[in-house]
Amino acid sequence: MTTATPSVSTLEARLQRLEDIESIRQLKARYCAGCDADHDPALLGALFHDDAVWEASGIGRFAGRDAITGYFSALRATGRIRNSEHCAMNPIIDISGDTATGHWRLLMLYTANVPDGAPQFFRIIGWYREQYRRVEGEWRFQSLFCQVEEHAAYRLQD
């Protein structure tokens, strides 16, 4: 039994695909970090193309980088979220030239400030469906949709 040695161009294409997938994973990690940095609009805005769309079930749809950063600025200004932890996992990323799609599972824990009482703890379970576009070697979000499947309070045990 003999196995064919892949050509250099085949190996280069395979390597490029892996590099693209890793770049998109890093993009998603920066998105989660920006959300967990009190929804920092400057950090988050840099991850989206000018004509991108951000949408989440139960929240709304924001078209264009300015609208997206405006939403995150408004959310930050409420002071409602004390801290959060966005965990995006189990990615399925498909690359096609300078575009790609991604599907991620989401587990988010956050602490909400409550005006008349102790902070409350919540969890969100859901998923993301995303489209990415590479321009001048850099991957950014073209669209991000988050579907919340469950949003519930939880209690810490003493």
PLM feature spans:
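General secondary-structure edge motif
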Residues: 11, 23-24, 48, 52, ...
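A beta-strand edge to alpha-helix "cap/lid" segment located at domain peripheries
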Residues: 2-12, 77-158
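Short, charged/polar micro-motifs that form catalytic or ligand-binding hotspots
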Residues: 34, 58, 118, 122
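Short, low-complexity N-terminal intrinsically disordered segments enriched in polar/charged residues
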Residues: 1-37, 41-42, 46
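A solvent-exposed, acidic/Ser-Thr-rich amphipathic alpha-helical stretch
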Residues: 41-107
